Amino acid sequence: MKYIGAHVSAAGGVENAVLRAVEIGGNAFALFTKNQRQWQAATLKAETIEKFKRFCQVHQFTADQILPHDSYLINLGHPELENRQKSVAAFIDEMQRVNQLGLKLLNFHPGSHLNKISERDCLAYIAESINIAIKTVPNVVAVIENTAGQGSNMGYRFEHLAEIIEQVEDKSRVGVCLDTCHLFSAGYDISSWQACEKTFTDFDQIVGYAFLRGMHLNGSKTALGSRVDRHHCLRDGTIGTAVFEYIMQHHQFDHIPLILETIQPEIWAEEIQFLRDLSAK
C-alpha cells in the first residue's frame, strides 16, 4: 500500500495536523512538532499529546505513516563545536517530542560544512551527532534527507548518505528520505522511466532500499544538476511526471510516507488523487 500525504501545518497544536491531512485525503502526513525557525519551544502538554494520539487512532494513522521534520536551524555537521553542540541538543529535543507523540521517524537535513572543514569531516560530525542523539532518546529513527547540494549542504550524493550510515553505530536507528526535487537538482536524472531505473538502482547499490524510510514528492523549478533547491507542483516544472508514475508502480516505495511539499497547498488533494490514479494505471 502507498502512504500518500503532504507536509501539513500544525498551527494551533500538533493534533490539528492530523485533521488537515484528513481534509486533503491523505493517508500519510509530515509536520513540524515545534516552530521550525526557532531554537526553543514550549514542552508538549499532556493534553496535546493525548489529543494527537487519539486523532491518529480515530483517523487510522500509524507511526509508519507520519514523517515529522526537524527545525531548519539545526546543523549536525557544524564545523564549530559550540554550535554543533547547540544543534545536537536541539535535535535531541526534537527526537524527544517525536517519541512523546508515539512516533518513530525524524526527518532532517544532514548539515553543512560552511566552507570551513572538509566534506569528509562534516559527514563524520553528522554521524557522531546522530550517535549521541540515538543513545539519548529511544525508539526514534534519524531519517537523513538527500539535499540539492545548494551552498555547502552535504547529502547531495548517495555516497554522502552511505558514509553517514556507515558511521552510525545502531543501523536500525538510521534511515533515508529521498526528495525528488533534490535528486534532480543534485544531478540525478529521474525525468524518464529509464533514467529512474538507473538512479534508483544506483541508490539501492550505494545506500540500499532497506534504509528508505520516506520520500518527498516534489516537482522542480530548476534544471538537472542546478544544485538549486526550488520546489514546484508535481505536474509542472523540469522533471516531468515519469518519476511519480515509477514510484507509484514499484513496491520498493510501499509502506513509507510519500509526502508532498509542492508549492500550492490548495491543490494537494488534487495531487494526491493524481498519484493514486498513477498507481492504478
Curated annotation (Swiss-Prot):
Function: Endonuclease IV plays a role in DNA repair. It cleaves phosphodiester bonds at apurinic or apyrimidinic (AP) sites, generating a 3'-hydroxyl group and a 5'-terminal sugar phosphate.
PANTHER family: APURINIC-APYRIMIDINIC ENDONUCLEASE (PTHR21445:SF0), ENDONUCLEASE IV ENDODEOXYRIBONUCLEASE IV (PTHR21445)
Residues bound to Zn(2+) 1: H69, H109, E145
Record field: catalytic activity: Endonucleolytic cleavage to 5'-phosphooligonucleotide end-products
Single Gene Ontology BP annotation: base-excision repair
Ligand binding (Zn(2+) 2): E145, D179, H216, E261
The entry's keywords: DNA damage, DNA repair, Endonuclease, Hydrolase, Metal-binding, Nuclease, Zinc
Needed co-factor(s): Zn(2+)
Family named by the database record: Belongs to the AP endonuclease 2 family.
Database matches in SMART domains: AP2Ec
Cofactor note: Binds 3 Zn(2+) ions.
GO MF entry, a single one: DNA binding
Coiled coil: none
Name the record gives this protein: Probable endonuclease 4
Sequence positions that bind Zn(2+) 3: H182, D229, H231
Gene source species: Haemophilus ducreyi (strain 35000HP / ATCC 700724)
HAMAP family per the UniProt record, alphabetical: Nfo
This enzyme's EC code(s): 3.1.21.2
